[in-house]
């Protein structure tokens, strides 16, 4: 790793306070361009790369069937790196100064229906054993708190408070927030805690959610869990933890919650981020409007 890249890594970790997952994503993208530049142009120093070299990389990515979304993410990583070099006066102008992101299709995240969520939870209404108790709790936490997948995975045992029905999570950029729990979910937390103490081996004791082998969960484990349960009740293409978080927000809005409250629960820094969840509640709003307005023919 070059000195500038190491300094950039330190900057992301210490100043921007990005998670290890995010930092690695940035570095992987930059290393990918570095490898391309070395192979294509015999140039190991990407600090002084020009836009022509970067454009060649973009063409290569597209030719290798990388989606526009994937290419744009890589360009965002590279742009952040050159912005850092500008800030530290390593370069005078960014080679990506006039770069425009590739166009991407707008895809709506379709939430689960209330019935689909109820149907999944009814499958494990009376969970038996550690894994079923854990799985039901994870599904219910996503649906009743809007917790992010990373927040759930990194939830510490010491941040679970069943006496006042709250959990403390560490969100993006290490921002803490307190999430309220429904009493029924607090009861599940206690039940899971009892099952958890019965594990023969606990390696990652600091973390609340574990595998049956006592290890901390990972991203793919949680994704597979949600996808597996919801595949039995839903034909939607995407069945992920994020869709369940999206469902949490949509169902709150459909049932009268105000946008600012939902924003706080989701841990968004701006209202604009929360507004993407409002499209799903428009159908409910339209229904109320059509039923209530006197000009609509009955």
Label for each model-derived stretch:
Residues 1-298:
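Conserved catalytic core of the tyrosine transesterase superfamily
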């Amino acid at each position: 790793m070059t000195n500038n890249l190491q300094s950039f890594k330190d900057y992301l970790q210490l100043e921007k306070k990005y998670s290890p997952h995010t930092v690695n994503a940035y570095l992987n993208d930059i290393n990918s361009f570095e490898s391309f530049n070395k192979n294509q142009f015999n140039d190991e120093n990407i600090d002084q790369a020009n836009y022509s070299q970067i454009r060649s990389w973009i063409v290569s990515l597209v030719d290798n069937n990388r989606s526009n979304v994937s290419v744009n993410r890589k360009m965002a990583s590279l742009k952040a790196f050159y912005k850092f070099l500008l800030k530290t006066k390593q370069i005078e102008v960014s080679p990506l100064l006039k770069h425009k992101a590739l166009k991407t299709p707008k895809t709506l995240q379709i939430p689960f229906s209330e019935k689909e969520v109820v149907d999944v939870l009814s499958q494990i209404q009376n969970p038996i054993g550690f894994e079923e108790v854990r799985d039901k709790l994870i599904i219910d936490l996503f649906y009743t708190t809007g917790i992010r997948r990373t927040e759930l995975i990194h939830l510490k045992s010491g941040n679970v408070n069943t006496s006042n029905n709250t959990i403390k999570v560490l969100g993006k950029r290490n921002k803490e927030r307190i999430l309220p729990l429904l009493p029924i979910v607090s009861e599940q937390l206690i039940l899971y805690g009892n099952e958890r103490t019965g594990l023969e081996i606990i390696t990652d004791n600091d973390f609340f959610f574990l595998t049956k082998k006592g290890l901390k969960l990972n991203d793919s484990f949680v994704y597979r869990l949600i996808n597996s349960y919801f595949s039995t009740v839903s034909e939607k293409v995407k069945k992920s933890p994020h869709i369940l978080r999206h469902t949490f927000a949509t169902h709150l809005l459909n049932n009268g919650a105000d946008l600012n409250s939902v924003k706080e629960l989701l841990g968004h820094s701006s209202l604009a981020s929360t507004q993407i969840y409002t499209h799903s509640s428009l159908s409910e709003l339209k229904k109320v409007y059509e039923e209530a307005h006197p000009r609509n023919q009955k």
